Regions:
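Dinucleotide-binding Rossmann-like beta1-alpha1 core, especially the glycine-rich loop
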Residues: 1-33, 156, 186, 194-196
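A general structural signal for well-ordered alpha-helical segments in protein cores
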Residues: 2-5, 24, 62, 116, ...
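Helix-loop-beta segment of a Rossmann-like dinucleotide-binding subdomain
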Residues: 8-9, 19-21, 28-72, 172-178, ...
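C-terminal catalytic lobe of FAD-dependent flavoproteins
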Residues: 19, 154, 196-293
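Short loop/edge segments at beta-strand edges and connector loops
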Residues: 23, 78-80, 209
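Helical element adjacent to the flavin cofactor pocket in flavoenzyme catalytic cores
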Residues: 47-107
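Active-site substrate-recognition segment that forms the wall
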Residues: 84-92, 101-231, 291-293
Length: 293
């Protein structure tokens, strides 16, 4: 893992991205509550730090985009479920059916993250996507002790502290297909054990709440942005668990694709038909296993 960390560090520096390598002494000064004992199950040798990296509150970002869209004349309809698509005689999509009535449109863009398979199924399409659950949970609030996000590949979890003092934890996928946003106890146990090993000072905290999000995992770990075989229907999804940070760029490329009818050069390779052409974009090299990405 240290070799992979150094390789990532060098790659970041080559691209002009601020990064620092922290040895044990520097890490102890930066994160004093971390267990750096030699007797740990996975002794910590060092860390990679991105000082300019940060955390954005998901809800606040959504509110900001919604307010900006509303100011520009976009009609945002809440609590309105899509139940199907209207189709013309030639098969072209001509609108959306919802619980509040039909909405006519010459072009329809689908961007529904974890429910991509379900919504596109309403149009008769089966996607090369699996839906998996990704859990997170928060503790009771405590005084500030952690002002960075810490993640580890060996223990396979991440930890941070919210502005309200809650300790936020998350780990890997639950490993089975589901739309139930509940998660499982084994995952909670594994992540909690790993967190206590790295930060023993949280061992007596109580969990306040837990939830799971539905992840749209593609067969190669890369997103799909572009046209579909159905005229007038466009799709943006398959972002696995990295979609939030890609929101501005993916939205811009998706808007360009819908407006012009052709993909932007930035998303031209991320087509739906790449899986049939053996043109997959498997950056991780994990193979055709959605849960491995």
């Amino acid at each position: 893992e240290m070799e992979a960390t150094m390789r990532r560090y060098n790659a970041l520096r080559l691209y002009g991205i601020a990064a620092e390598f922290l040895d044990r002494a520097a890490l102890a000064r930066r994160v004093p509550d971390m267990n750096l004992g030699r007797d740990a199950r996975w002794p910590i040798l060092g860390a990679l730090s991105q000082p300019r990296g940060g955390v954005a509150r998901h809800d606040a970002v959504a509110w900001g985009f919604a307010r900006g869209a509303d100011n520009r004349g976009v009609d945002i309809i809440q609590n309105c479920e899509v139940t199907g698509f209207q189709r013309g005689a030639d098969g072209r999509v001509t609108g959306v059916l919802t619980t509040r009535g039909p909405i006519a449109s010459d072009k329809v863009g689908v961007a529904v993250a974890g429910h991509s398979g379900h919504v596109m199924g309403l149009a008769g399409m089966r996607l090369p996507i699996e839906s998996h659950l990704l859990q997170a949970f928060v503790s009771e609030p405590v005084k500030p002790f952690l002002d960075v996000v810490v993640s580890t590949g060996a223990l396979h979890f991440y930890i941070s502290q919210t502005d309200k003092g809650e300790v936020l934890l998350g780990g890997g996928l639950d490993g089975y297909n589901s739309y139930g946003q509940r998660g499982t106890m084994p995952n909670i146990h594994e992540v909690t054990a790993a967190a206590i090993e790295m930060f023993p000072n949280i061992s007596r905290l109580k969990w306040m709440r837990q939830w799971a999000g539905v992840m749209d995992m593609t067969m190669d770990g890369s997103p799909i942005i572009g046209k579909t075989p159905i005229p007038g229907l466009f799709f943006d999804g398959g972002w696995c668990y990295g979609g939030f940070k890609a929101t501005p760029a993916s939205g811009w490329c998706f808007a360009h694709t819908i407006a012009t009818g052709e993909p932007h050069p930035l998303n031209a390779a991320f087509t739906l038909d790449r899986f049939g052409r053996s043109a997959v974009i498997d950056e991780k090299g994990a193979g055709p296993y959605p849960k491995a990405h």
